[in-house]
Amino acid sequence: MDHFRRQMRAKAYASDAEVLHQLAALAPSPEARAEISRQASAMVARLRAEAKPSVMELFLAEYGLSSEEGVALMCLAEALLRVPDAATMDALIEDKIAPSEWGKHLGESHSTLVNASTWALLVTGQVLDAPETGMAGLLRGAIKRLGEPIIRQAVARVMREMGQQFVLGQTIQKALSRAAGFEAKGYLYSYDMLGEAAVTDEDARGYHMAYADAIAQIAKSASGKDISSNPGISIKLSALHPNYDLQHRAEVMDVLVPRARSLALLAKSAGIGLNIDAEEAARLDLSLDVIEAVLSEPSLARWDGFGVVVQAYGKRAAYVIDWLYALAEKLDRRIMVRLVKGAYWDTEIKLAQVDGLPGFPVLATKPHADMHYICCAQKLLAMADRIYPQFATHNAHTIAAVLHSARAQKVTNFEFQRLHGMGEALHEQVLQEHGVACRIYAPVGHHSDLLAYLVRRLLENGANSSFVNQIFDAEVPAHVVAADPFEKAQEAGPKISLPADIFAPGRRNSKGFDLSDPEVLAHLQAQRVRRQTWSYGDLGHAHPVHSPATSDQIGQIRFLSADQARQLAAAATPWQITPAERAAVLRKAADLYESHAEAFFALLTHEA
């Protein structure tokens, strides 16, 4: 198992090409890919001919991220999370809604609700964009001022309504009641209590209690003899501890592990599954430590209801799957693995660039992520003796690829999953025609918790290349919607600058350190504790420097005399008229700082 963890760390920032090359043996053959594409195209054609799309699918088709109006709505939804007061909210709404051309969308959707929303946005934009001159302008200005509170409430209501398309209920009781209709059709559920990472320990205790209460309520619906036929729950580890990062590992293992373990024991007693949700890449290594510690609890022996979510866009996904299989063998049990595409792509790309990391922890293009998903799915199906595969996708091509691989490997014990409010018609087709179990991932929470979840879903599915965005768009042919990602990957798309190159050609970005990698931290720590004395300066009298913490001498420094300082200042005068040489020296100094960063860190910790 340690072998897989070492590989995982070594390949965290490998190139997309290297990651996919290592999984080439798992990729479908050209003949299989052709058959998969045919089946996927047939699925899409049948959906368009027979199915009724959901409101959210119609909304995304009309207002995807390919339109200025769609971008405005995404920005508005995301920014409303951080608006501190009514005045700022009014300014934000005016900035995002007034300039957009809502009229061109009027009457374009098949949904009355979507068209009504468009009409409301059009009227709002006209009020906010009123000219401010003349008597008419004064009158319209008054209407604008009087209308701002109403508009503010209306926009918040629209955002809330959008969020409710994705949320099953505000309480677990309401969600369970609403789920009964789909359960009667043969669907299963996995409930997710909405909420972002805990900020305080009080938050964490509150989330823990909410999870425990939800498990108790879900248990009442768990009538099946097998865990895979019962509802389940998903939990976020970041909700159970306010400092869920590697720098607080000891505290996390002491506090978070018992909390997660207690929830697992409750789920075991209830006869339901419990999945650990995937989060940002920086938390992956620590999450595996927590997962192993929880699953190693003797009282959880012979329980096959523990699950882990793996994000296929992550470059380490295949190694995580190998590690989970090894853990299942070690503990002699079966682990559920939910394979998802991934929900934090934009964040991961931006953080890697800002932090100057060696590369990206995620695959840089959607076709590469789709290819990786298919290869990881093949791996999971081959491990079905210890893994219960759960394939979360709304993409017809991905579903066709999984079905093809399952038939080839003669694996029947797996399930598909979809988000509540998304992919309903596609999964209904899979359930009815292929007899494969389908589980609905159902968020549960209050209005105050909706927007962050909504933004992630819209960013995932709102892009013009998204399957969900295109599936009911008649202008996009079925074979294009269900295109083979292995072929699409050959097309040259926009290149995302690597972290080191974001300021090119002017200069290279400064180098950062992945402080979520235990091996990076161990290297920095080794430099810090290594006995070393530093000496700086070539002129003047030497003065010893001591650590303020231990009084040990850590080196010496030489100070210039007044005469020496005057001589250097005089010599520096011509320096002002040689910008090229000065720039070269500064670049050289920056390179030296970077190449000796570990020594500087060590010195700083001794002198602090």
Show the residue positions of the predicted features.
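Positively charged, amphipathic and often flexible ligand-engagement surfaces
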Residues: 1-508
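Short, structured beta/alpha segment
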Residues: 469, 473-606
